[in-house]
């Protein structure tokens, strides 16, 4: 029996022991900023406010245990439709999946319960699947949606020299429409996670840098949320700080937009709002910030302005991206 199954059975035995004393409670670790989780929240059947969450958690644990014993996988959507009266919404399944990850200290990919992939990719990339299928991005007329389960990718083949991640789908589509592969002299792979990336997108980027030895660059908005997205790719998600193995790219190169470039944009910048400043303070409190990233966040605080990638879209493909990559202008 594997470790996951044993941990789930341990949780079940503890719950049964508590039930003898009339206490139907599950302990779920809270988010942490490091590898040690010391705080828990109690999800109790005895409490009307958390009774539904308790039932969905039990449902999720039972399905994960079944997967570990029998093999296979479920989708978030499939789990919802298996018992819609209990679950009530797919978002409840997504929340319970993350809670189970915290309880078992693992990533969603390891559970075998999969969410639809958000990531899009274009360029020189061939994904050789374990079932024999080949997903060749160069053969598609448009972008290729990344597979839901990246662990079913047996091998990745590419002649690309690097990976370029862009924060938003709109920028991804704009670059393709401007023939970014034709105007740039070097072969590369273009990826977007459509904002905050899912585990699948982060896993693919990790594998490209580790297995294929490609450099990875990222282009995000010059605002605190863009910086946070860059940090998710680089260091992992705060909500899953307990399990980032295979999902991070520490050597990720941030080519822009840098807040220090905002003064040169002129009319392309807008004022920060209260939520932006709160996010900046949250990010500055992190202990994994590189000095250059911290300095750029301080710049945001000083100028009280932010800018989107679209503000430089007209010269992004011919000037901005090639200049940043060829001259190593990254943080």
UniProtKB/Swiss-Prot annotation:
User: Under the cellular component aspect of Gene Ontology, which terms does the record hold?
Assistant: nuclear chromosome
Write the record's keywords in alphabetical order, separated by commas.
DNA-binding, Isomerase, Magnesium, Meiosis, Metal-binding, Nucleus, Topoisomerase
Question: Which positions in this protein are listed as binding Mg(2+)?
Answer: 167, 221
The disulfides recorded in the entry are: none
> Which Pfam family is one of this chain's hits?
TP6A_N
Which reaction is catalysed here?
A: ATP-dependent breakage, passage and rejoining of double-stranded DNA
Annotated Topo IIA-type catalytic domain residues: 1-120
Which SUPFAM superfamilies does UniProt cross-reference here? Answer: DNA topoisomerase IV, alpha subunit (SSF56726)
Gene3D superfamilies xref list: 3.40.1360.10, Winged helix-like DNA-binding domain superfamily/Winged helix DNA-binding domain (1.10.10.10)
InterPro entries attached here?
Answer: Spo11/TopoVI_A, Spo11/TopoVI_A_N, Spo11/TopoVI_A_sf, TopoVI_A, TOPRIM_Topo6A/Spo11, WH-like_DNA-bd_sf
Q: What family is it from?
A: Belongs to the TOP6A family.
Q: What is this protein called?
A: Meiotic recombination protein W68
UniProt source species:
Drosophila melanogaster
Q: What is the lineage of its organism?
A: Eukaryota, Metazoa, Ecdysozoa, Arthropoda, Hexapoda
The UniProt gene name for this protein comes to mei-W68
């Amino acid at each position: 029996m594997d470790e996951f199954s044993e941990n789930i059975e341990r949780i079940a035995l503890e719950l049964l022991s508590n039930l003898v004393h009339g206490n139907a409670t599950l302990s779920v670790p809270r988010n942490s900023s490091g590898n040690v989780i010391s705080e828990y929240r109690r999800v109790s059947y005895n409490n009307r406010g958390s009774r539904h969450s308790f039932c969905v958690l039990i449902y999720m644990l039972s399905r994960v245990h079944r997967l570990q014993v029998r093999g296979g996988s479920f989708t978030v959507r499939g789990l919802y439709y298996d018992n819609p009266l209990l679950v009530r919404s797919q978002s409840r399944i997504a929340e319970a999946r993350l809670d189970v990850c915290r309880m078992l200290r693992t990533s969603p990919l390891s559970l075998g319960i999969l969410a639809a992939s958000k990531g899009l990719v274009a360029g020189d990339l061939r994904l050789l699947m374990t079932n024999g299928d080949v997903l060749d991005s160069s053969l598609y007329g448009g972008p290729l949606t990344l597979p839901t389960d990246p662990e079913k990718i047996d091998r990745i083949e590419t002649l690309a020299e690097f990976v370029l991640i862009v924060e938003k789908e709109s920028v991804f589509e704009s670059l393709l429409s401007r023939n970014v592969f034709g105007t740039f002299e070097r072969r590369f792979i273009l990826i977007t996670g459509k904002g905050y990336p899912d585990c699948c997108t982060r896993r693919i980027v990790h594998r490209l840098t580790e297995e294929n030895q490609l450099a990875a660059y990222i282009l995000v908005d010059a605002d605190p949320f863009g910086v946070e997205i860059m940090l998710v790719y680089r260091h992992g998600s705060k909500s899953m700080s307990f399990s980032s193995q295979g999902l991070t790219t520490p050597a990720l190169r941030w080519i822009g937009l840098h807040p220090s470039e905002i003064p040169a944009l002129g009319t392309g910048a807008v004022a920060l709002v209260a939520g932006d400043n709160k996010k900046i303070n949250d990010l500055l409190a992190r202990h994994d910030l590189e000095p250059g990233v911290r300095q750029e966040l301080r710049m945001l605080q000083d100028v009280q302005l932010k800018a989107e990638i679209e503000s430089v879209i007209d010269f992004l493909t011919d000037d901005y991206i090639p200049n940043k990559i060829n001259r190593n202008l990254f943080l």
